[in-house]
């Protein structure tokens, strides 16, 4: 089940694995980078492209650009430009993106509770 999402440069395709809502959510935010972009916006608020690159996980520029475009076109994040200079473009969560906050908080709590035996340095929530 493939759907096209219109973008400014080209069309991105999402290959939906099934009609299951959980599977569909994972098709969008289930990859490492998309969920970490959302995490950074939840924790820090609006972020610039270069601030995302400073993340300790070390996202590459091409992956970051692709994920920002995908999340923007899916209306989970939006680009803001306070002074109309392209150098100062930033991204912030939309209401749909902000609705992921309790999901990520619960995922973090679950990981802290159930993975600490295997990951001795995991942060406690």
Residue ranges: model-predicted function:
Residues 4, 102-125:
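Amphipathic alpha-helical dimerization/coiled-coil segments
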Residues 53-86:
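Canonical helix-turn-helix DNA-binding module
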Residues 20-60, 92:
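N-terminal helix-turn-helix DNA-binding core of bacterial DNA-binding proteins
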Residues 6-16, 33-38, 48-49, 102:
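Short histidine
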Residues 1-29:
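N-terminal leader segment of winged-helix/HTH proteins
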Residues 25, 40, 51, 67, ...:
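Residue-level recognition of specific faces of alpha-helices
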Residues 30, 83-107:
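Basic, amphipathic "hinge/linker" alpha-helix immediately C-terminal to the N-terminal HTH DNA-binding motif
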Residues 1-5, 67, 78-80, 122:
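Short amphipathic alpha-helical interaction elements located at domain edges
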């Amino acid at each position: 089940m493939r759907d096209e999402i219109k973008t400014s440069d080209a069309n991105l395709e999402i290959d939906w694995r099934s009609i299951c809502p959980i599977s569909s959510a994972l098709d969008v935010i289930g990859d490492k980078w998309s969920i970490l972009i959302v995490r950074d916006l939840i924790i820090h608020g609006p972020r610039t492209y270069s601030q995302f690159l400073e993340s300790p996980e070390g996202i590459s520029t091409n992956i970051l650009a692709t994920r920002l475009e995908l999340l923007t076109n899916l209306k989970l994040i939006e680009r803001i430009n306070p002074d109309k200079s392209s150098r100062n473009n930033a991204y912030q969560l939309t209401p749909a993106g902000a609705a992921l906050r309790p999901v990520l908080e619960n995922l973090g709590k679950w990981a802290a509770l159930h993975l600490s035996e295997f990951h001795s340095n995991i942060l406690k929530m």
